Amino acid sequence: MSVTLHWFLPTYGDSRHIVGGGHGIPAGAAHSDRDASIDYLASIVRSAETFGFTGALIPTGAWCEDAFITAALLARETTSLAFLVAFRPGLVSPTLSAQMAATFARHAPGRILLNVVVGGEAHEQRAFGDHLEKDARYQRADEFLDVVRRLWAGETVTHRGEHVDVESASLALPPTPVPPLYFGGSSAAAGPVAARHADVYLTWGEPPEAVRKKIDWIRSLGEEQGRKLRFGIRLHTISRDTSEEAWAQAGRLIAALDEDTVRNAQAGLARSQSEGQRRMLALHEANRANGSWTDAHSLEIAPNLWAGVGLVRGGAGTALVGSHTEVADRIADYAAIGIDEFIFSGYPHLEELYWFGEGVVPILRKRGLFGAAADLAAPASIPFVGSAR
């Protein structure tokens, strides 16, 4: 099999240190040394395209720049790279969201992927004018995505639901091909919505056995819907010529953190409503409690899987750390349990992309795990009649 590789765009700024912020941490908490200018982000996406990456994830939230506008500006900077645009269903109407994606798809064919983010932080949702509780946000996402899918299929849609109400909605130019939907969520409410609508189910970087259980869960729900999903994982990476060099870099990243910074970040993350965030915190809970987090190796929770990033960063909090061969081995391990797509990042994002692209990618190619033939996810079949983490 051949895996699909994506990179990540730090639209909140970049640094040689771990940049905090993200899920559960207030806007403005991230401290970066490099401005997230279009010129800087363009240097990252052009490099990702050179190394053969399929796409680049652009995050959403109060702590970063708007993903759709960023993607539109960067599309002219590349020729083939796709943009995995994170968006929150319900902050704008499904008709407008469907139209925005269709317009992007028409002007940059095959180069928009959509990452559905239901939202795990009630306080952040309220800042955007959204006062629904978590389970209700999943119910709304279910209705929302049903309308979007039907609009993309060329239907004229009237939908009067509990959360979505549109009348005689249609698109003048439905997209061809239809943008694939990426969807993550670890709570009981998330699974059925992902099974009905997602083309790719995303998980953060937990140990392989935990990831396998998630895959089995979502796969079984998809089979009940008559659908077959692909699976993706979100990880950071520290890859070097030797394992010792990689772990030394991990040590440098956490050496720059102090106890107060970690404590404040963890307090914010602990308030998160996200089940995925709770699972991320649990990965290094014991090490934080006994103070051993200052030793990089103490945060190795599975072979070459390091939980140090999650000390101060919300969301994806783990990294593959090791020699280029070791990182390639771990990618192969995840692929063997069913992971099709990988979304990577590192600090700083441009330099770490080069370490990965020049060190790991050639090994993956040699093993037949990665190549130019790796295609975008083909949208899974969707029942358009009838109808969040």
Predicted segment positions?
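Conserved, mostly hydrophobic/aromatic
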Residues: 48, 52, 74, 104, ...
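An alpha-helical appendage that flanks or caps ligand/catalytic pockets
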Residues: 2-22, 29, 128, 134-175, ...
